[in-house]
């Protein structure tokens, strides 16, 4: 047990430093190319911080643990929205630009509707489903690139001091590697610790693994807040949620199709269909609707999301 605990701590340290460098590199690139930080957060930063989910879900699917691949994607969306974004909002509520949110939010709900449709109608995620999800990922990237080209940065961003481009790319790349390695150490050794304590695999997937693979987003969000880049944090969370459904699930399903696990029920029905997917929609609606309609996020909103996440975790360990 000592070695897993030590490796768990090493993974956490890698995540913290990796998140710090990744934010520095991403914001430097945003300033250099006059791109709004929220758009950078919704694409470049999201890809880097979603790498752990891609690796964990793909490995799980290939080794016959489809319940982990499935639970990791949904659990990470819930964790990102109701824990990570909630912390960001509760600590530093403020205004957001609704226009910059429309594309990632729209793509998320289109992907989520397709994902839920497959879950409720067949319960089987086949290779064609994975390819459709990957096509959505490509479309999302294209739309964001076009938006970046057509959206000028605010005046203060254009006047910001720029560092060496090679250094910014280096920070971005090294940060992404540290994030991926750190998350891998955290999930592998954290799962060993959880299994030693007798926690079921399905619960591990929706809570522990989801939280572990979402730690890069959490570290990036906290680092962004500390550096005063709240827009980058929110954009990263929403972008990561899109990637969890279209990239993480797309890759794992395309490589190793799986069916929804049936080992947990509520009132005789599949627990995922009764609770997990509805909660995923609920927390994203609570996170995004006020931002789109009012252009701001409030502290009560963040607290409400945190309460939902706490209740979700409690139910997972009691059903």
Residue spans of the language-model regions?
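Hydrophobic alpha-helical segments, chiefly the membrane-spanning helices
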Residues: 1-319
């Amino acid at each position: 047990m000592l070695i897993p605990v030590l490796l768990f701590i090493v993974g956490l340290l890698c995540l913290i430093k990796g998140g710090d460098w990744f934010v520095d590199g991403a914001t430097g690139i945003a300033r250099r190319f006059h791109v709004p930080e929220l758009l950078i957060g919704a694409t470049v930063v999201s890809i880097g911080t979603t790498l752990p989910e891609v690796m964990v879900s793909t490995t799980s699917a290939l080794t016959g643990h489809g319940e982990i691949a499935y639970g990791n994607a949904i659990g990470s969306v819930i964790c990102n929205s109701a824990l990570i974004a909630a912390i960001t909002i509760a600590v530093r509520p403020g205004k957001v630009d609704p226009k910059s949110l429309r594309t990632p939010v729209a793509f998320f709900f289109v992907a989520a509707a397709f994902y839920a449709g497959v879950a409720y109608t067949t319960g089987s995620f086949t290779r064609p489903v994975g390819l459709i999800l990957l096509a959505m990922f490509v479309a999302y990237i294209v739309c964001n690139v076009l938006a970046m080209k057509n959206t000028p940065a605010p005046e203060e961003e254009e006047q910001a001091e720029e560092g060496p481009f090679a250094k910014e790319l280096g920070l971005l790349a090294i940060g992404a590697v540290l994030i991926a390695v750190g998350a891998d150490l955290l999930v592998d050794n954290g799962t060993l610790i959880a299994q030693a304590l007798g926690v079921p695999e399905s619960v591990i997937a929706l809570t522990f693994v989801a939280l572990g693979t979402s730690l890069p987003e959490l570290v990036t969000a906290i680092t962004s807040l500390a550096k005063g880049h709240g827009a980058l944090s929110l954009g990263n969370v929403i972008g990561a949620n899109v990637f969890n459904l279209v990239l993480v699930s797309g890759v794992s399903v395309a490589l190793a199709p799986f069916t929804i696990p049936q080992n947990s029920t509520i009132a005789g029905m599949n627990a995922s269909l009764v609770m997990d997917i509805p909660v995923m929609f609920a927390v994203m609606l609570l996170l995004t609707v006020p931002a789109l309609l009012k252009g701001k996020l409030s502290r009560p909103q963040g607290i409400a999301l945190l309460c939902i996440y706490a209740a979700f975790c409690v139910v997972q360990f009691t059903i």
